[in-house]
A protein has these predicted regions:
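Conserved class I S-adenosyl-L-methionine
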Residues: 2-55, 69, 73, 91-94, 152-184
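A short, aliphatic-rich alpha-helical micro-motif
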Residues: 52-55, 118, 140
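Short conserved AdoMet
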Residues: 53, 99-100, 134, 148
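Class I SAM-dependent methyltransferase SAM/SAH-binding core
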Residues: 61-63, 67-114
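A short acidic, Gly/Pro-enriched loop at the edge of an enzyme's catalytic core
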Residues: 115-124
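A short SAM/SAH-binding and catalytic strip from SAM-dependent methyltransferases
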Residues: 123-137
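A short glycine-rich, Lys/Arg-flanked "PGG" loop and its adjoining helix->strand segment in the class I
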Residues: 137-152
Length: 184
């Protein structure tokens, strides 16, 4: 786990999980999120916020925090402290630049490697990040261990229509459309 005091100038090549450290992908993603005209703003964010408990005085963990939007929202809703982590050095750097709140701690770490104190958080949130992890059961066990008794875990993942590989039409040798694959 990397803290805010360490140097991130020599980042390794991004893994498939960490495409956000590819400079071209990151800038395209940043532009997309700045427009906020996609499904995140229209559906996912309001749905997630609608599930939240009262955050006043709560300790919150944000897994896959991206630009830190939820961390800042949690503090605006009265959370006592927020720990937010992301595997992407670019995301953590951007989140820190956008945040001026000492009660929010950003960590450069993968969700799989995140180790927290037992029963440290009232709420754990993960917005559109768990579909990147390989060992979902292990992460859920860690989340459960990190929650205080009566704590809440709220998460979203991308819909399979977004993550499925598009197959497209089956075509003949000349490129003419023959049919759509029956088991897409």
């Amino acid at each position: 786990m990397t803290t805010s005091h360490e140097n991130h100038n020599t980042a390794p090549a991004p893994s498939p999980q960490n495409i956000y450290d590819d400079p071209r992908f990151f800038e395209g993603y940043r532009t997309l999120r700045e427009q906020d005209t996609g499904l995140n703003g229209a559906l996912e964010i309001p749905a997630m916020r609608g599930l939240l408990p009262d955050l006043r005085g709560r300790a919150v963990l944000d897994l896959g925090c991206g630009f830190g939007d939820f961390a800042r929202h949690a503090r605006a809703q009265g959370a006592d402290r927020v720990t937010a982590l992301d595997v992407s050095a670019n995301m953590i750097e951007a989140a820190r630049a956008l945040t001026h709140d000492p009660a929010i701690t950003y960590l450069h770490a993968s969700i799989e490697d995140c180790v927290t104190a037992q029963a440290a958080f009232d709420l754990v949130v993960s917005s559109l990040a768990l579909h990147y992890i390989a060992d979902y059961p292990a992460v859920v066990r860690r989340v459960f261990d990190s929650l205080k008794p009566g704590g809440t875990f709220i998460f979203s993942v991308e819909h399979p229509l977004q993550t499925a590989h598009p197959v497209g039409w089956v075509r003949d040798a000349e490129g003419n459309k023959l049919h759509w694959p029956p088991d897409h």
